[in-house]
């Protein structure tokens, strides 16, 4: 019989802090117990469970508030990417998750790879794109991107300078 464990930290795929869980013996012996992520449930640790769950609820409320604030910030931001293209407007490479994270940081928004869906492999086309993000506590948000070719940027700057010279 597998022993019950009390999680001391959130563990992906297993549970959250304060949960009573059952896991495979090797996972328990080689990962959860040595890393201090769980303890074997006993009468004493069950009293600890209530305290951990209370802390988790407070942390969850703070995380949700932060996620809602971040989602609100993302509504007003459009990340602009300038990429090299060939004569047929095919991009060289793609706009990757790391590119999006870096551009968001420049706008004052902190994102991580965990916020992006695992299936997202990058953007390979010009135009406007919306990437769905998964924030903490089940909050979702959309990241708006505009991918433009370098020559479009150059043409816009030339038009602006021509308008300034005329006016």
Curated annotation (Swiss-Prot):
Annotated Gene Ontology cellular component terms: ribonucleoprotein complex; ribosome
UniProt entry keywords in alphabetical sequence: Ribonucleoprotein, Ribosomal protein, RNA-binding, rRNA-binding
Protein's GO biological process: translation
Transmembrane segments: none
A Pfam family: Ribosomal_L9_N
Highest rank taxon of the organism: Bacteria
Gene3D superfamilies: Ribosomal protein L9, C-terminal domain (3.10.430.100), Ribosomal protein L9, N-terminal domain (3.40.5.10)
Similarity comment: Belongs to the bacterial ribosomal protein bL9 family.
Job description of the protein: Binds to the 23S rRNA.
Record-given protein name: Large ribosomal subunit protein bL9
Source organism per UniProt: Chlamydia trachomatis serovar L2 (strain ATCC VR-902B / DSM 19102 / 434/Bu)
């Amino acid at each position: 019989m597998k022993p019950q464990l009390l999680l001391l930290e959130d563990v992906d795929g297993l549970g959250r802090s304060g949960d009573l869980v059952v896991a495979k013996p090797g996972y328990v012996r080689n990962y959860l117990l040595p890393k201090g992520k769980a303890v074997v449930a006993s009468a004493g640790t069950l009293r600890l469970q209530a305290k951990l769950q209370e802390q988790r609820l407070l942390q969850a409320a703070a995380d949700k508030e932060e996620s809602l604030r971040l989602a609100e910030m993302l509504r007003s931001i459009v990340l602009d990417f300038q990429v090299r293209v060939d004569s047929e407007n095919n991009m060289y490479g793609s706009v990757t998750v790391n590119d999006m994270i870096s551009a968001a940081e420049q706008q004052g928004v902190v994102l991580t790879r965990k916020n992006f869906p695992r299936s997202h492999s990058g953007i390979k086309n010009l135009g406007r794109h919306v990437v769905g993000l998964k924030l903490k506590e089940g909050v979702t948000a959309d990241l708006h991107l505009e991918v433009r070719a370098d020559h479009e940027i150059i043409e816009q700057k030339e038009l602006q300078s021509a308008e300034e010279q005329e006016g």
